[in-house]
Amino acid sequence: MNCTLKIIGKGDSVGNNEWIGIDNAHQNNLKNISVKIPKHQLTVFTGVSGSGKSTLVFDTLVAQSRRELNDTFSSYVQHILPKYGRPAVDNITNLPIAIPIEQRKMSGNVRSTVGTYTEIYTFLRLLFSRIGQPFVGYSDAFSFNHPQGKCEVCDGLGFTKKINLKYLVDFNQSLNEDPIDFPTFGNGAWRWKRYAHSGLFDLNKKIKDYSKEELDLLLYAPQQKLASPPEKWPKTALYEGLLPRIKRSIINTDEGKRHRKQLEKFVSTDICPTCQGSRLNAKALSCKIDGHNISDLVAMSLDELQLLIQKIRNSLVQDVKTQINKRLDALITIGLGYLNLARSTDTLSGGEAQRIRIAKHVTSSLNDVMYVLDEPSSGLHPKDIERLYKCLRVLKDQGNTIILVEHNPLLIQRADYIIDVGPGPGVNGGSIQFSGTYGEFLKSDTITSVAMRENERLNNHTNSSFKKWLSVRDKNLNTVQNVSLKMPLNALTILCGVAGSGKSSLAQIVASELIQKGIDVINISQKNIGISLRSTPLTYLDIFDDIRKLFAKANSVSPSLFSYNSKGACPRCKGKGVIVNDMYFMDDVVSECELCHGQRYNQKVLQYDYKDKTIVDILSMTVSQAVDFFSGITRIATGLQAICDVGLGYLKLNQSLSTLSGGELQRIKLSSYLQKKSSVYIIDEPTNGLHLKDIDHLLELFDRLVARGNTIVIIEHSLKVIRQADWLIEMGPEGGKMGGKVVFSGTIDDLKKSNDAITKPYL
């Protein structure tokens, strides 16, 4: 059904352009939803995981706004912009321009830093060019991306890559014997041919027997035209030695990212010995303000930098100071004062990246736009959530509409308007359960409102409850200095504290101590688990082969017929279910395959069934549905039940892991360990993206693991989880250099009696 926009008149029921109207939305699992959203207010969409919140907000509201905006550009510009499919909705009215601020990591560009992204570094360059002594040039002289300012040794990167030849080249082999240990240089590969077909080398001669001239040509020669190229040599090709070719075309490129593990075998990264990581040349570093060069300033925490900038008294830079302070204020207010401007953006967490984007918009001149945020509280301590809320209020007070997809009770309580989607996940969701104010919400009987009204019981364990302990004495790591503490074993210990306070560093210290004592440790972080478009919950848990064998046996055919990576693949998308369009300098655009409609398989596969279900029917099931379907097959049912146990029963069996959040990926990883024997689990924020009701299931799982004699150490901010801790360790008092200290260690009962001012007030 076509989506149309109608102009609202003054007397229309939506009224005075103050409400966004959605009429009959039926995208994905949405059940013909019609709802109104107040403009210039802070609205929270909540509901259990998989209920349809993101579909309604991002796939319907944001998608239509971006489509309409893109249609206003010329045909040429539209051609290079991302394409947004027409959302399944009858009508949307009073729709502002949408700016989505998602929880995704920033660009992997090694030249992008917190300073360059926020433009603070741009203004620091202006500052030094105007009042720095001695004068060394204008702002370009302080840019590590400009020939005038960058260190020539590291090319403005701050680090150098060194290739260890003994791990890359086997000198005991000839070129015909595959001596180069990198995939695209293998025997017969196109890069191998650049050496084999150059006419410069005897292909059967051992490399160790090469003359110095031959070895230099093979390894170090710069790009050059061949004087007398052989017949097989491409006419336009340039010859280049192995090391410069790898440095130029593989290291720090997309190909290098794909072969990261292979590169790690022979490439080491070291701080540049010339600029010591500052990225700048000696001339730029010689210019100082009050004894500090520009590298000193970018290495300071944002809190320290603001104090230094405020001390500068010079009318020549008053306008520059104003711009710097405005941006620093926004970042510090949102709780990122522990960062420094030198921090590479690709090392930021998804939550940190999102908050930097929010801070950037706080200083924007735009207004009357719709900011849409996906779980902005993720990874934040309640104290940091208060800081986040202040920034969201500033955005709202500037005349903007704020929409959050959120589970956190602290932000739900502070919303001007709440829309609850549910009641359940997947096919059991997709309906509006409630819309109204927070006071009205608490009187409703939705799953979310009931969970928020529940009085949480506090864990009443005492020190005498624990029999075994781990002691840590005088340990240092990153911001954690000289830390000493004790922690109970066979218990649930929570590490909490504001962002950047040293929780992750302390977890590493604890893991190291346990390993030294011969105790097995399973570390479950939110880092990438090696996913691709082809990865699904079934492939990750290694139970898809069992399902394919069931189909093969029932139909007397090969199991490979039921693999979308083999004979069963759709010929158009090659089993991916989607078509990926490379947008070069922008994010890839992913669209559903028009031939298989996202099913991944060719039509021949659909002729076969198992218990009256095709392979596509089964892969379209949720994990919870599949547990019942395979209840008689222990290996399959046990693996699927483990996914349900971590609160992910709503996932589809064929859902690409690349579409999951960091928290969901982590819980998939956790589910794969549940059947293994261990004594200690260290888990990083497992409640990310979880509804309050789903957290209950996770706590039950942790209780079972502890009851089996395991120790669980969790880095966590959820008050629901903190209240159930057997032991609590709080780091702080702030982030960065102001953190790294144990400010509290003990039971919840001990915390209630303490004078703690960080976590206690929120319990």
Q: How would you name each of these model-derived features?
A:
Residues 401, 414-420, 723-730:
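Conserved catalytic segment of ABC-fold P-loop ATPases
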Residues 374, 380-381, 684, 690-694:
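ABC-family nucleotide-binding domains
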Residues 381-390, 692-700:
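Conserved D-loop/post-Walker B switch-helix segment of ABC ATPase nucleotide-binding domains
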Residues 115, 420-453, 730-762:
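Conserved beta-strand-loop-alpha-helix hinge in the C-terminal portion
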Residues 3, 7-347, 353-369, 391, ...:
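P-loop/Walker A nucleotide phosphate-binding surfaces of NTP-dependent enzymes
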Residues 442-480, 762:
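Flexible nucleotide-interacting loop at or near the entrance of a catalytic core
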Residues 405-407, 715-717:
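H-loop/switch region of ABC-family ATPase nucleotide-binding domains
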